[in-house]
């Protein structure tokens, strides 16, 4: 069978490419070996946020007296939390399938094998395509730490499905995944220790705000070991032993469970990528241009496989650009205003340049900061909670970066992203009328 577009991978990049191509009138084949929605929908973005919302609700109930609401006894049911997570995932997977079907996308379940740029095999069937879009995503990276193979560690998948709480949890890696799980388990009463090799958690996020978030979770009982290298792992009857070294010397952490959350890497093996001879980056990702085109004509790459930004919303936009290229529509990918969010409680979000990235690029910038208490809505809904909004301006007073610590940072950061993408100056942004009272008004107040 022949299609105008063959897509390998049904995650955010893959299903967005398929839907966009279908809407554009192209014949589309989407091959997915697991479940539609990819890591994001099945074992990443959505399930973690579902768990975190349960934890946040539990936290709110425990502290309801701050808002003059008395709840005598507050408890949680972990198996039901996990069951609800699974229900949410199933519902959204069905939604993705329905959208693809409505746009005449042919969906095949199985492992794809690329024969050449116009030929893909899946099972006993061979398919021909005019254009090939690779959206194979990324996989958990487990570093070769001595003893790692002898330890019964968790990955994010295990943590998502555990129906029993460990008394203690050691997390290797203080990035987004590590901190979100640290937040979840800490809220439910687990003793959490985060071991991070860098000098601050959440590498890539604003360092000042990351430190403030860490300080908040330190108050809540999480122990952080920064600038700390894990040198060995072992398993005992008491649990996992994490041996480490840092400036203070050598030490170890013993925890009932160990979560490995060091990071992810693009999936480049197992589907015949080598048969395409695509140009790759130094880190093994596939090199693409601003139209998501690879070094081989009619072959496109979107999502984590590009190595640019391992974020679902980036993948969605890349997929749109790739299909627009196939359709002959003028479009190009921009990474200037890709927002990043960590769904802890409080949330932390940022878009554009951080102070660290601006310094590295030798950009002259001005920083404006304001406590979130300048937002009336924030004060009304966050009793006894502090937060910070930070905006970076360049020499022309254009907005080049914005960062927020405080709820709901995830819902307001797009306001700043829009300003950055459009190249707005502080004066232009100041003219925008914000509804009152909203937390988003903080972006008007800060200027």
Question: What annotation goes with each model-predicted range?
Answer:
Residues 45, 136-191, 195, 223-224, ...:
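Glycine-rich dinucleotide-binding loop and its adjacent helix/turn
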Residues 140, 284-297, 377-390, 394:
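FAD-binding beta-loop-beta segment adjacent to the flavin cofactor pocket
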Residues 2-3, 19-26, 31-165, 193, ...:
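Glycine-rich flavin
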Residues 149-165, 252-327:
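FAD-site-proximal beta/loop scaffold in flavoenzymes
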Residues 6-34, 39, 46, 50-57, ...:
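Flexible, glycine-rich terminal cap/loop adjacent to redox cofactors
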Residues 1-3, 123-131, 248-257, 295:
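Core beta-strand elements of the Rossmann-like FAD/NAD(P) dinucleotide-binding domain
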Residues 1-13, 165-175:
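Beta1/beta-strand and adjacent pyrophosphate-binding region of the FAD-binding site
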